[in-house]
UniProtKB/Swiss-Prot annotation:
Residues 124-134, 427-440 have a biased composition (Polar residues). Residues 1-10, 406-425 have a biased composition (Basic and acidic residues). It comes from Staphylococcus aureus (strain MRSA252). Belongs to the FtsQ/DivIB family. DivIB subfamily. The gene is divIB. Residues 1-174 are cytoplasmic. Its main location: membrane. Residues 196-440 are extracellular. Residues 12-21, 88-97 have a biased composition (Acidic residues). Residues 196-264 form the POTRA domain. One of its GO terms (biological process) is FtsZ-dependent cytokinesis. Keywords: Cell cycle, Cell division, Cell membrane, Membrane, Transmembrane, Transmembrane helix. The lineage of its organism: Bacteria, Bacillati, Bacillota, Bacilli, Bacillales. One of its GO terms (cellular component) is plasma membrane. Residues 1-97, 123-154, 397-440 are annotated as: Disordered. This is Cell division protein DivIB.
Length: 440
């Protein structure tokens, strides 16, 4: 009876073991499935899930262990007569416990492996989801990379800044040196090439001094070069000529000299030792100048001392165009007018005036001369003179007709011509005064 009972107990215990093993396998399988699903969907919470799962597994392990102990105690109470069976049952329970411990360790290993798989699945199993949202993920990744690149920029150290500064300075030095070398090379090529030889000399502003004389003073030769030609020496040599007032010389690359001459005007010809010499605007007589070009200069006669200086000043204030109308200036004082002068013009008129006002009044002479009536040959129909000493008036000469008569008819005719000439000249002077007032 005892043997049958022990056999039944062993069979029941084996069945219980099988059920327990099946239960544990099912539970472990379910747990692994849950872990895998959780690992795929909640990969960001792996550490928390692993800790919670470990606690959960530990609780199940303790529950199973308590259950086995209680079952073993009940069997010990039912079969108190058989200590051998109890020992076998204890051994079996111990072995079951050891098996449970082994399974628990194996499950924990599986759990760790599943966690590793979950981590790997984060990169591999989530690929389909990542492929479905490539555009959004790529945008976020690029933004993160840009931010990381910006944040990863580290400030330069002092030594690095010095290195950067040295490199920049070296680049600047190299560029400056290359520019200087090229510039020096160009200058050397120009200096020793035919381009540097003076090939053209342009002279402007010379009316009385001949061009050949200016070229002789400049001293330009066939082998003269631009960089050896001294402008200062040439200017000083040219200004020694009394006719030349000032000189400007400009070098125009590659091989041209521009010479601008400003001359002292010849305002009159003065008799000196039986010869008429040019008188300059600065009051100097031009002696020993046979090659001077004298175009149209009035002849001064009878002036001395301060009156000569005043007349020179008056002529210098006139324009060259007005001076060309004057053929001769004579000092002709009267009792009441010590500054009275007489001018004889190139168009056959005589002008009476005063030294102090003659320069202002003579600027209207071209218009006055054109207003007078002339014949086909250009001579005045009514010969006479213009009085500019006080105001301005035209006074015909008496007896200017072809037949001189003592009758009253001829006297009346002469007076009528004189009045007509005065009216014509006065109308011209009035027009001139109006134009001058408008211009002012």
């Amino acid at each position: 009876m005892m043997d049958d009972k022990t056999k039944n107990d062993q069979q029941e215990s084996n069945e219980d073991k099988d059920e327990l093993e099946l239960f544990t396998r099912n539970t472990s399988k379910k747990r692994r499935q849950r872990k895998r699903s959780k690992a795929t969907h909640f990969s960001n919470q792996n550490k928390d899930d692993t800790s919670q799962q470990a606690d959960f597994d530990e609780e199940i392990y303790l529950i199973n262990k308590d259950f086995k102990k209680e079952q073993g105690n009940e069997e010990n109470n039912d079969s108190a007569s058989s200590h051998a069976n109890d020992n076998n049952i204890d051994d079996s329970t111990d072995s079951n416990i050891e098996n449970e411990d082994y399974r628990y360790n194996q499950e924990t290993d599986d759990q760790n492996e599943s966690n590793g798989i979950a981590v790997d699945n984060e990169q591999h199993q989530s690929a389909p989801n990542e492929q479905n949202s490539d555009s959004n993920d790529e945008e976020t990744v690029t933004k993160k990379e840009r931010k990381s690149k910006v944040t990863q920029l580290k400030p330069l150290t002092l030594e690095e800044k010095r290195k950067v500064r040295r490199k920049r300075q070296k680049r600047i030095q190299y560029s400056v040196i290359t520019i200087l070398v090229l510039l020096i090379a160009v200058i050397l090529i120009y200096m020793f090439s035919p381009l540097s030889k003076i090939a053209h000399v342009n002279i402007n502003g010379n009316n009385h001094v001949s061009t050949s004389k200016i070229n002789k003073v400049l001293g330009v030769k066939n082998d003269s070069r631009m960089y050896t030609f001294s402008k200062k020496n040439a200017i000083n040599d040219l200004e020694e000529d009394p006719l030349i007032k000032s000189v400007e010389i400009h070098k125009q690359l590659p091989n041209t000299l521009n010479v601008d001459i400003t001359e002292n005007e010849i305002i009159a010809l003065v008799k000196y030792k039986g010869k008429y010499l040019p008188l300059l605007e600065n009051g100097k007589l031009l002696k020993g100048s046979n090659d001077v070009k004298i175009n149209d200069a009035p002849v001064m006669d009878g002036f001395k001392g301060t009156k000569e200086d005043d007349m020179i000043k008056a002529l210098s204030e006139m324009t060259p165009e007005v001076r060309r109308y004057i053929a001769e200036v004579t000092y002709a004082p009267s009792k009441n007018k010590q500054s009275r002068i007489e001018l004889f013009t190139t168009d056959g008129l005589q002008v009476i005036g005063d030294i102090s006002t003659i320069s202002k009044k003579m600027k209207y002479y071209p218009q006055m001369s054109q207003s007078l009536a002339r014949d086909s040959s250009g001579k005045l129909k009514t010969r006479g003179y213009i009085d500019l000493s006080v105001g301005a008036s035209f006074i015909p000469y008496r007896g200017n007709t072809s037949t001189q008569s003592e009758s009253d008819k001829n006297v009346t005719k002469s007076s009528q011509e004189e009045n007509q000439a005065k009216e014509e000249l006065q109308s011209v002077l009035n027009k001139i005064n109006k134009q001058s007032s408008k211009n002012n």
